[in-house]
């Protein structure tokens, strides 16, 4: 109750201050309707397809045998961020995982099934050769991280964890639909490691790529003169309550658009700064931000902290006279976490990723005040063999935009 009252007092103060400051605030030319240099000709891609790796009895430690080994073959691969240096050379960071994991069924007569998690991270250099005005061939090569999380039975390791770096190569074709949209299709090879009975991996995928091309001057000017406000800076104070885990469960299980976690947070406070770098005419804004956060776990009341940088997608749902309502989604923000063992669970090491999603509003005459609610998540995406994951429930935020 004290926290709620403090937030209410702070909100009223900010609203009063924003009204006063709006009288004399100088007008600055908005230069954020064109992609900044580091984003122009950058891209992301989403692909799905077929994966094969020779999982069998060979991966089991001596003394273990499975009744059967189920190897699903559907895989997803995304380029989280790529950049074209010119028409022929680009670099990209990728993430790949099977939709369903390998299962060892009936190990030593057990009635259940045990899963082996496989995940791959990659950083590759990509060369492109135009074949026609729309079709190009490409080859890629670089560094891959292979992460296998095995399982134990009765306190004994049945399939061991494996984590290693290796070269990775691939090739394929691209079909350019427009300057920004392309269809892609290709194959990828990642070597195994005999010393750990890890088989090599072959994946064939297809999908699409979106490239952020510099906008024409007419579009830039149209967006700039739209009359809709997009604050350039936002400073927010956030408080996590320890309540509302049903929201996390709903969006991670019932409608899988977010993630859960094994470690629960009881209380937390965070300070965020967001800087807008691009926006469209009315709906979309892209921010980059940083945050420092302090948390207390639910089970053991263990204290830990995080330091993050992150991208943030902001979508304005309604533009009304009293407020501009928006949704936010942030994915894979690199994070330092002070503890890796929390509530007797192994979350990996001191490197992880921050994700969050929520709703908010800019209010006040000049939209200087931001209020909102969101949920958070920390996870290394199983790029490390241990990844308990941290879920953070309903979090209230209050901020000042300028």
Feature map (PLM): residue ranges:
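Short glycine/proline- and aromatic-enriched beta-strand/turn motifs that initiate or cap beta-hairpins
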Residues: 22-82, 201-275, 394-401
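Residues that define the transmembrane beta-barrel architecture of outer-membrane proteins
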Residues: 40, 73-77, 115-121, 161-167, ...
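Transmembrane beta-barrel strands of outer-membrane/channel proteins
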Residues: 44-52, 93-97, 139-145, 185-189, ...
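Flexible, solvent-exposed loop segments that connect beta-strands
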Residues: 55-70, 98-118, 145-165, 195-197, ...
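Solvent-exposed loop/turn segments connecting transmembrane beta-strands
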Residues: 71, 193-201, 263-264, 298-303, ...
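Gram-negative (and chloroplast) outer-membrane scaffold detector with strong preference
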Residues: 80-152, 207, 265-337
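Residue-level signature of outer-membrane beta-barrel architecture
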Residues: 83, 127-129, 173-175, 189, ...
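Repeated loop/turn-to-beta-strand initiation elements of outer-membrane beta-barrel proteins
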Residues: 88-91, 133-137, 175-183, 214-219, ...
